[in-house]
């Protein structure tokens, strides 16, 4: 599933090119996870004012309303003036005078939803309840630590839930906890101030580095300009079960936690 770094990389890869564009048409394919929420003709003539990100959602601000885009489990966006003919898994196109934005989504768990604004019930249903933005200025340690103290959930599962901090997917949760030296099964409320600060810093560091590397391409992710990500090539623990820890030489372990694969070093992450 594309996580925060992949979504941010996608945003950066086409935001400048589409800003100021006028919508000329909409192409809708097979049904996605949620319906568009308006007739496609309503969007024709609208101008794209900018592209933002909230967690794993992209927000295309229009001069009237906005489009919320979620990439689902296997989705990706492409933006270009001349795209090849639509394929069987291309389910949405926003055609503008700057180029076409196309959603490719083989499993159709993604969505493009129109809303009148962020206070629209459709937008609130998707955006409300998410935690702090880890790459934003409001990712304050005090609020983050308060969120940890209130939960008895194992820290790895709390990171994945997105209610305290948003967008930390499985690969990044494993890498963050390794960098912070915290065992994935440790209860969030048991993490004291010193370790919480290490965790807070590790979240920023890992996600920022992932964005710089273009995200992670584990199967089929690419940004809107077709570029693959490379973060997975330098992972310390994720995908390295049985291999020596890059830091101490202990074999990396693999376990199942909340139906997800968890990679950790038993020596570097003792508690």
UniProtKB/Swiss-Prot annotation:
* Cofactor (UniProt): Zn(2+)
Secretion signal, residue range per the UniProt entry: none
Query: Which GO MF term does the entry hold, naming one?
Result: 8-oxo-7,8-dihydroguanine DNA N-glycosylase activity
Annotated residues that bind DNA are located at 89, 107, 151
InterPro entries according to UniProt: DNA_glyclase/AP_lyase_DNA-bd, DNA_glyclase_Znf_dom_DNA_BS, Formamido-pyr_DNA_Glyclase, FPG_cat, MutM-like_N-ter, Ribosomal_uS13-like_H2TH, Znf_DNA_glyclase/AP_lyase, Znf_FPG/IleRS
According to its UniProt entry, the protein's GO biological process terms are: base-excision repair
The UniProt note on the cofactor reads as follows: Binds 1 zinc ion per subunit.
**Which Pfam families did the record assign?**
Fapy_DNA_glyco, H2TH, zf-FPG_IleRS
Keyword Translocase part of the UniProt annotation: no
Catalytic activity, per the record? Answer: Hydrolysis of DNA containing ring-opened 7-methylguanine residues, releasing 2,6-diamino-4-hydroxy-5-(N-methyl)formamidopyrimidine; 2'-deoxyribonucleotide-(2'-deoxyribose 5'-phosphate)-2'-deoxyribonucleotide-DNA = a 3'-end 2'-deoxyribonucleotide-(2,3-dehydro-2,3-deoxyribose 5'-phosphate)-DNA + a 5'-end 5'-phospho-2'-deoxyribonucleoside-DNA + H(+)
The record places the active site at 2-3, 56, 260
By sequence similarity, the record places it as follows: Belongs to the FPG family.
Assembly and partners?
Monomer.
Function recorded in the entry: Involved in base excision repair of DNA damaged by oxidation or by mutagenic agents. Acts as a DNA glycosylase that recognizes and removes damaged bases. Has a preference for oxidized purines, such as 7,8-dihydro-8-oxoguanine (8-oxoG). Has AP (apurinic/apyrimidinic) lyase activity and introduces nicks in the DNA strand. Cleaves the DNA backbone by beta-delta elimination to generate a single-strand break at the site of the removed base with both 3'- and 5'-phosphates.
- Name used for this protein in its record: Formamidopyrimidine-DNA glycosylase
Please tell me the species this chain comes from: Acidovorax ebreus (strain TPSY)
């Amino acid at each position: 599933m594309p996580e925060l770094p992949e979504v941010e990389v996608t945003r950066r890869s086409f935001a400048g090119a589409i800003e100021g564009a006028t919508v000329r048409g909409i192409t809708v394919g097979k049904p996605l996870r949620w319906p568009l929420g308006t007739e496609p003709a309503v969007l024709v003539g609208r101008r794209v004012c900018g592209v933002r990100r909230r967690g794993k959602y992209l927000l295309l601000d229009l001069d009237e309303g906005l489009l919320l885009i979620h990439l689902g489990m296997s989705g990706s966006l492409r933006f270009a003036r001349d795209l090849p003919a639509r394929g069987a898994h291309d389910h949405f196109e926003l055609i503008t005078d700057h180029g076409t934005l196309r959603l490719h989504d083989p499993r159709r768990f993604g969505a493009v939803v129109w809303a009148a604004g962020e206070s629209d019930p459709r937008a609130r249903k998707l955006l409300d309840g998410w935690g702090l933005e880890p790459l934003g200025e409001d990712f304050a340690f005090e609020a983050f630590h308060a969120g940890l103290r209130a939960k008895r959930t194992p820290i790895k599962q709390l990171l994945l839930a997105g209610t305290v901090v948003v967008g930390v997917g499985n690969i990044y949760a494993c890498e963050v906890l390794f960098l912070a030296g915290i065992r994935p099964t440790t209860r969030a409320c048991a993490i004291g101030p010193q370790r919480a600060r290490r965790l807070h810093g590790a979240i920023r560091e890992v996600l920022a580095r992932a964005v710089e590397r273009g995200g992670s391409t584990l199967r089929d992710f690419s940004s809107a300009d077709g570029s693959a990500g490379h973060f997975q090539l330098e992972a310390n623990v994720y995908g390295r079960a049985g291999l020596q820890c890059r830091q101490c030489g202990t074999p990396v372990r693999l376990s199942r936690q909340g139906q997800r694969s968890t990679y950790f070093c038993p020596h570097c992450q003792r508690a």
